């Protein structure tokens, strides 16, 4: 699981490098750093302002007290003289502290302005990079849509030029094989029906001849018996053509053969009506069949798949049209 997550992370990083999104991520981190820097600079500006205001207030208080002492210098006491000396000595220190606070405030303000300018620059760079990345993704999406449409058109042409004729030829060949198989079965059935009476006719005379020969061999050679035997044999021989009827069967054999030949010729004639798959007539029939009123039986799954494919194709075409007519 850890390897899968690491592989997904590496794949996402590679994809970001290819699309140029890694630079946008770096700019985001830089903007976050600049925001922290600007926040700290503004805090220092606020502290410097407070320190500068405190220094100004301290010096103003000292100068105000010095002025009050100078106004009543004719009534000074020893403590007033000592206080005036201390305030006059600290006035220079207060002035230096005020100047240092002013310089610190100016430096903090300059740093804050630089941080704000750098932040604005980083934001503009990020906006520019995002625009470039968006244009690149839009361009890749447009080319990808064109590529998918080209693949679909190529598959359609391959299916119509190669697969559809092969499937049609296979169907025609299968139909021919089934017709030939049915004709062969019908021939075999007719052959069996023709040979069955002939075999029966050949088996029927054999039994009487065997039966008649037995009494002839066992009989006593008398003139009356010989006459009766000869009459019986002659009547049996005359009855054999009547019992066995091979003549009508031999006449039906050419008729059945002719009917089978007629059936085969009609099947070949119907198959010859189909034009070759690479001809213009075949394309014309195919296009007219697409817009014909022929009833079809389609499953719900095929209908849903057709609707989804149509919706995807329409969305792709509309996206392509919007991408083409959209102003830069």
From Swiss-Prot:
Q: Which UniProt keywords apply?
A: Coiled coil, Membrane, Mitochondrion, Mitochondrion inner membrane, Transit peptide, Transmembrane, Transmembrane helix
Coiled coil start-end: 21-123
Question: Which residues lie within the region annotated Disordered?
Answer: 225-259
**Where does the chain cross the membrane?**
143-163, 305-325
Q: How does it assemble?
A: Homooligomer.
Family, per the entry? Belongs to the SHE9 family.
Q: What is this protein called?
A: Sensitive to high expression protein 9 homolog, mitochondrial
> What species does this protein belong to?
Aspergillus oryzae (strain ATCC 42149 / RIB 40)
**What lineage is on file?**
Eukaryota, Fungi, Dikarya, Ascomycota, Pezizomycotina
